[in-house]
Design a protein with these regions (language model features):
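Peripheral docking tails and interdomain loops at the edges
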Residues: 265, 273-278, 387-389, 409, ...
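Cofactor-binding active-site loop characterized by glycine-rich and histidine/acidic residues
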Residues: 41-164, 300, 305, 314-315
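Non-catalytic terminal/interface segments that mediate subunit docking, oligomerization
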Residues: 250-359, 364-374, 472-475
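Glycine-rich ThDP/TPP pyrophosphate-binding loop and its adjacent helix/strand module
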Residues: 110-267, 271-279, 283-288, 408-518
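A glycine-rich helix N-cap at a beta->alpha junction
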Residues: 87-97, 163-177, 370-382
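Glycine/charged-rich beta-loop-alpha catalytic/anionic-binding loops adjacent to active sites
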Residues: 29-36, 96-113, 136-141, 314-326, ...
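Cofactor-/ligand-binding subdomain signature composed of acidic, glycine-rich
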Residues: 1-34, 252-268
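Acidic, glycine-rich active-site loops and adjacent beta-strand->loop/helix elements
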Residues: 70-75, 144-151, 172-178, 218-219, ...
Length: 587
């Protein structure tokens, strides 16, 4: 097997086309071996195998610099840079390899830690400028998918690369897909370029000042080598536009490109996956609720930014929603500003966005939405430890970020009924923007009626009144708070249990009301505690006699963490919380 002997791209240099094709076939097999057992990005990697082999054959990494956009297509690159064991070895070997480019893992060949979209060209322009200042001659190659071109930073990178005017190669990997279908006017020109074999008169890359080459057969190694050789050493900004097939070489991934963008382990023979457990999900509940409400309210608009299934909007449901669902591609800044405009114009937009992508649009939420007090609704999903766990996709920072913005209410429902009551109120009110943090600890149901109205001033809900100890448990950690209260009861402590509901500000009346017969307050939040909900409560009590234990995750860049281990490291296992409370009461 060739790839077991390939320790670096230099080992490809002496191979002929036939041998390189075998390398590509073996690399594709290695990728399938990993993703079928370990899960991961399927379609993006399978479609970029031949291009990766050709790039490493033509260029001279690590001298020449490859910068991957998102880097969810870098598995073949890893196979060819000494990490084949992470694709052919044991599960432990696979666990040792990140699903994204990682200098911590391989500083020689992985230039940046990357996981979010539209960044490669901008990063590459930095390397371009550094090379030009130092007077060296390495090739700088940015690799970006057509889906990532919907993001604003990609436009900014193209603008700067053209302005610099020196050698940079931008490989546009055009598979006619984002995670789902592409959205945006740019794709009309990409289609025209594909249909004309790159010759149509209106070429937006040329208009930007780039040299341009098109290759229709983007999965043909021999032709890829020729086009890459033709631009190697260029002293001009150059785009190489290659037309590839997402999922190439694996029929199920070709047949259903959206479903096979990323996936859990599967049977390689037929692409079948273990049946999903028959449990409720907020994605399914939300999309069904929205579709039902849309029948009666034509102003209700479901908004997504490249991840429609995060809102439960499958292709079938997107068709049912019609014009009442809009996806703007991977463009969170556009989404935030657009929902502000929609709300100003009398619509009721609900934008579903992953916690990890909030940071991509902080400015637009603060400036375009909150300063204008437009009553848009932001539906934050995936926030907390039981979510994505790669260093580039940490979902722990949305509470500190959103709660730092004046003019935004951030609600934390604890169960299904409370979530939909809050959602209905947020849509109906017309005074200010509302964000909701969708629980990530499964769908729990209320055991008593929930409130249907939520005011603009924070109002905590005391679920049980005890004494000495008060547990204020927010959102996904409410059930944890319930269990901690039961454990404390076993030790003779009748703890007060509070559902705060509001994350962005404190309920002074409720907190002051605890001072008379409580000595200890525990706050629990499923996210970063630095700048978070609990620290606001600790600050409120200040120099008073009340002791406050702030429960949350310490600020950090955690990578591929185990949720229970992270909780344990932060003293957030239920038994640890009880131990700390007992110790605090005794000290």
């Amino acid at each position: 097997m060739y790839i077991e002997k390939i320790k670096s791209p230099a080992d490809l240099k002496g191979l002929d086309i036939k041998a390189l094709q075998i390398v590509a076939d073996e690399t594709r097999n290695a990728v399938l071996n990993r993703v079928s057992q370990h899960g991961g990005h399927v379609g993006p990697n399978l479609g970029f195998v031949e291009a990766t082999v050709a790039l490493h054959y033509v260029f001279d990494a690590p001298k020449d610099k490859l910068v991957f956009d998102v880097s969810h297509q870098c598995y073949p690159h890893k196979v060819l840079t000494g990490r084949a064991a992470g694709f052919l070895g044991s599960i432990n070997d696979m666990n040792a390899i990140s699903g994204y480019s990682s200098p911590a893992e391989c500083p020689e060949y992985d230039n940046f830690e990357v996981g979010h979209t539209s960044t490669s060209i901008s990063l590459a322009t930095g390397l371009q400028k550094a090379r030009d200042i130092k007077g060296t001659d390495e090739n700088i190659i940015a690799i970006i998918g057509d889906g990532s071109l919907s993001g604003g930073e990609a436009f900014e990178g193209l603008d700067e690369a053209s302005e610099l005017g020196t050698g940079i190669i931008i490989v546009v990997n055009d598979n006619e897909m984002s995670i789902a279908e592409n959205h945006g006017g740019i794709y009309k020109n990409l289609r025209a370029l594909r249909e004309s074999n790159g010759t149509c008169a209106h070429n937006w890359f040329k208009a930007w000042g780039f040299e341009y080459k098109y290759l229709e057969e983007g999965n043909d190694i021999e032709k890829l080598i020729k086009v890459f050789e033709s631009v190697k050493g260029t002293d001009k900004p150059t785009v190489v536009h290659i037309h590839t097939e997402k999922g190439h070489g694996f029929a199920p991934a070709v047949a259903n490109k959206e479903a096979w963008h990323w996936g859990l382990p599967f049977n390689r023979l037929d692409g079948s996956r273990p049946p999903k457990p028959a449990v409720e999900t907020y994605e399914e509940l939300f999309s069904n609720w929205m579709l039902n409400e849309m029948k009666h309210d034509p102003t209700l608009i479901a908004v997504t930014a490249g991840t429609p299934t995060a809102a439960g909007f499958t292709p079938e449901k997107r068709k049912l929603a019609g014009k009442q669902h809009i996806d703007m591609g991977i463009a969170e800044e556009q989404a935030a500003a657009m929902i502000s405009g929609m709300a100003k114009g009398g619509l009721h937009p609900v934008w579903t966005v992953y916690s990890t992508f909030i940071q991509r649009t902080y400015d637009q939420i603060a400036q375009d939405i909150c300063i204008n007090a437009n009553p848009a609704v932001i539906n934050v999903v995936g926030g907390g430890v039981n979510s994505m766990n790669d260093i580039t996709h940490i979902c722990l920072f949305d509470i500190p970020m959103l709660c730092s913005i004046p003019g935004l209410i951030y609600l934390a429902p604890t169960n299904c009924e409370e979530y939909f009551a809050m959602l209905r109120w947020a849509i109906a009110q017309d005074k200010m923007p509302i964000a909701l943090r969708v629980p990530t600890n499964g769908v729990h149901h209320a055991t008593a009626p929930v409130d249907t109205e939520y005011g603009y001033e924070p109002s905590y809900k005391v679920m049980h009144r005890g004494s000495r100890v008060a547990i204020i448990a927010a959102g996904s950690f409410y059930q944890k708070g319930e269990h901690v209260a039961r454990l404390l009861a076993d030790k003779g402590i009748d703890a007060t249990l509070i559902n705060p509901r509001y994350l962005h500000a404190v309920d002074a009346d409720t907190l002051n009301g605890l001072k008379a017969d409580h000595q200890f307050v525990v706050t629990l939040e499923d996210g970063c505690k630095d700048g978070g909900f609990g620290e606001r409560i600790a600050s409120f009590y200040g120099t008073s006699s009340m002791r406050v234990l702030v429960g949350g995750i310490k600020k950090g860049l955690y990578d591929r963490f185990d949720a229970n281990e992270l909780l344990a490291d932060n003293r957030l296992l239920d038994e640890q919380i009880v131990e700390d409370v007992m110790e605090g009461l005794e000290s």
